[in-house]
Amino acid sequence: MQTQSEYADTHVTHVKNYYWRIAGFYFFYYAFIGMFAPYWSLYLQSIRFSAVEIGILMSVQPVMRMLAPSLWGWLADHTGQRLRVVQVAATLSAVFYLGVFVTTSFWGMLLVLALMSFFWSASMPLVEATTLSYLGKHTARYGRLRSWGSVGFIGSVVGLGYAFDYIAISWLLWAGLISELGILLFSRQLPETQVAAHHTDQQPIFNILLRPSVMLLFGACFLMSAAHGPYYTFFSIYLVEHGYAKSAVGGLWALGVICEIGVFILMPRLAHRYGFTRILIASFALAVIRFMMIGWCVDFLVLLLIAQVLHAATFGAYHAASVGLIHELFQGKHQSRGQAMFGSLTYGAGGMLGGLISGPVWQYYGANMLYTCSAFMALLGLILVGWNSSGRFSQAAY
């Protein structure tokens, strides 16, 4: 079996052969998020769900991101058929998504979103593992490839934002279907990658997970995801209630992602100069500032624009650095499950917590307190990641 360095040198030269296939998957996957995150709550509001019901329904996807990826990651590592698992999951996700066209009841929508999200959430951790395996030792280049997901997000959020100033929000369902079909198409174009041998292969994966430095990283990232829960659940409703047009809502979402793309492109240089851990610390610090600005400065457009620019740090830099660290920590046969567990315990569990608390806090205490809670959770994450600022994250796998 090839060593890590031999595998990287052999395969990184072929990245361009599959560049657009991987980029296409990222494009449609995040185009779906660009449809879902800003506008699904508005669609639910249009069919007369309450704030608490919207909070619950918007938390279904994070719940599935917590429960499903570890199962799919185990299946991919156990069978050695990572790509096949992605394809099956993409197919079933598209099939179950069709249910949104036939239900407007709370329990019906809950069931459809749960089934769709169970399979939808399976794909990305496995594709992340595939992409990073394919890049080999050149993981800093991940950001440039991942930036095509941001392009898909922008196209979706801006296009739909302008469209919904003229057409009914119910057309959102068709945009989601197009994205699901794109995911399905490109899942069948992805490269199959070999898993390089690593000396941690004989260790149970929980031996790695339970290392103090790894637990601190997971805990901090859990809090960052929880902090973003209110943003993804109520930000669009928040803006509309303060008089912003839907096209302006789309523009503000897009601004953050445009800046995110810039960070992804610059990530190889930033990672080389500062390292992933320092980038994480800066991301958490800026998240505290950003959420306070969103909560208390929504009527000041200039400050709101600055808050959206900070999305480059609170998601773009944060995501690239955290995924890079997870790839260093979980190597060899643990790659798929490592990324899957990271997705489950951070984006899944953290997003679920943030989404679930957002409904009651929004309804009883208002948006100011809701986004102050987000800032507080980011502050707690900053404390955890700062605790490990000596760089032990990246050394934990060795």
Segments (PLM) and residue ranges:
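Juxtamembrane intracellular "pre-TM" segments in multi-pass secondary transporters
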Residues: 5-16, 187-221
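Helix-loop junctions at membrane interfaces in 12-TM secondary transporters
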Residues: 101-113, 295-307
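Helix-to-loop junctions at the C-terminal end of transmembrane segments
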Residues: 67-81, 164-165, 263-276, 362-363
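Structural signature of the two symmetry-related core transmembrane helices
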Residues: 84-98, 278-293
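Interfacial helix-cap and linker-helix signal at transmembrane-aqueous boundaries
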Residues: 44-45, 75-76, 147, 162-167, ...
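Cytoplasmic helix-loop-helix junction between adjacent transmembrane helices
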Residues: 114-148
